Structures are given as structure tokens and as C-alpha cells.
């Protein structure tokens, strides 16, 4: 008995996206909102001392809060951003967090 060569099998043309984005792996954002209480110089100072920004970057973020009403001042893992929000609250700033996306 003679065996015939097996026929080639076709591979399905499937592309797998290895960079699938789900809500679980999106970063969290710390947002500082404009308020009528804190002076611009104080907000700049808090961004420098609490978040470690340079004077120039802290001033840019403060101006964004002042002119646009809010600014994203940090991002990352949920626990880290929660910590940043708490520190900003202790300093008297209005800060919230939300997941990117």
C-alpha cells in the first residue's frame, strides 16, 4: 500500500494584538482642579515640594490649572496616584483621580 503525501494545511490569517488595552492596564491620573482659595505661588510651591517638580514645570502646571481649570499632575499605578491625591489634599489642594481612557 502506497501512502500519498499529505496535503498542505492552510494556516488561518489571524493577527493577534499583543498590545490589547483593557481598563485594567490603563494608568490612573491625578488631577488638580482650580479653586478660589489657594494662591498661584502656593500651588507652584506644593507641586515642587509634594510632587518633586522643578520650579519651571510646577509653574507650567499651575498655569494650566489656573487657565484651563485643571491639570493632570501625575499618573501611574492606582496606589501611587491615591497617595499623590492624599498628599495634595493634606496641602489643601482640590485633587481627584480617574483612570485614563
Curated annotation (Swiss-Prot):
Which domain of life does the UniProt lineage start with? Bacteria
For this chain's UniProt record, which GO biological process terms are given? protein catabolic process; proteolysis
Q: Name one Pfam family in it.
A: ClpS
Question: Known InterPro entries for this protein?
Answer: ClpS, ClpS_core, Ribosomal_bL12_C/ClpS-like
**Subunit structure and binding partners:** Binds to the N-terminal domain of the chaperone ClpA.
Tell me, what does this protein do in biology?
Involved in the modulation of the specificity of the ClpAP-mediated ATP-dependent protein degradation.
Q: Quote the NCBIfam families the UniProt record gives.
A: PRK00033.1-1
Could you tell me what this protein is called?
Answer: ATP-dependent Clp protease adapter protein ClpS
